[in-house]
Amino acid sequence: MTTIVCVRKNGKVAIGGDGQATLGNCVEKGTVRKVRRLYKDKVVTGFAGSTADAFILRDLFEKKLELHQGHLVKAAVELAKEWRTERSLRRLEAMMIVANESEFLLVSGSGDVIEPEFDVLAIGSGGNFAKSAALALLRTNNELSAAEIVKQALIIAGDIDIYTNHNHVIEEV
């Protein structure tokens, strides 16, 4: 379990996640890097769910990005199609948020590719806490940047969700 949150504000997109990995009810590691840059550092992805499954999906997404020359939506849709139809991938338990400088999407194992209605997406066990905090800050605080809103949302999620820690990685595109 984890928290990944993505915010768009003033032409910037920031995505961040915590670093906690659990096995059952035990914390196995607190410094997992769940947010990574891809495709010439122009795309950032964050994952929630099974770590091994997420790495497989991230690698597949990176291949789709290369194939489609960095076109985020096309790569995400093609990944979702393959995820749903390829028998070996159907059992993978993970979700991803993918972002570039102008758009960001949620990609799920059920084949969903969702563009946010508002300028916030969040996934993982602390996702609803982070989304609520980010939406509130986005609507009421004009001084915070996208990255600062992501940081505050992750702090709040980590204070509430036992599967989210305070070791954050935040990237901005």
UniProtKB/Swiss-Prot annotation:
PANTHER family: ATP-DEPENDENT PROTEASE SUBUNIT HSLV, METALLOPROTEASE TLDD. A double ring-shaped homohexamer of HslV is capped on each side by a ring-shaped HslU homohexamer. The assembly of the HslU/HslV complex is dependent on binding of ATP. PROSITE patterns: PROTEASOME_BETA_2. Gene3D superfamilies: Glutamine Phosphoribosylpyrophosphate, subunit 1, domain 1. Belongs to the peptidase T1B family. HslV subfamily. Keywords: Allosteric enzyme, Cytoplasm, Hydrolase, Metal-binding, Protease, Sodium, Threonine protease. Its EC number is 3.4.25.2. The active site is at 2. Na(+) binds at residues 158, 161, 164. Protease subunit of a proteasome-like degradation complex believed to be a general protein degrading machinery. This is ATP-dependent protease subunit HslV. It catalyses: ATP-dependent cleavage of peptide bonds with broad specificity. CDD domains: protease_HslV (cd01913). It is found in: Cytoplasm. Pfam families: Proteasome. The keyword Metal-binding applies. GO terms for molecular function: metal ion binding; threonine-type endopeptidase activity. It is an enzyme of class 3 (hydrolase). Its main location: cytoplasm. GO terms for cellular component: HslUV protease complex; proteasome core complex. One of its GO terms (biological process) is proteolysis involved in protein catabolic process. The keyword Coiled coil does not apply. Allosterically activated by HslU binding.
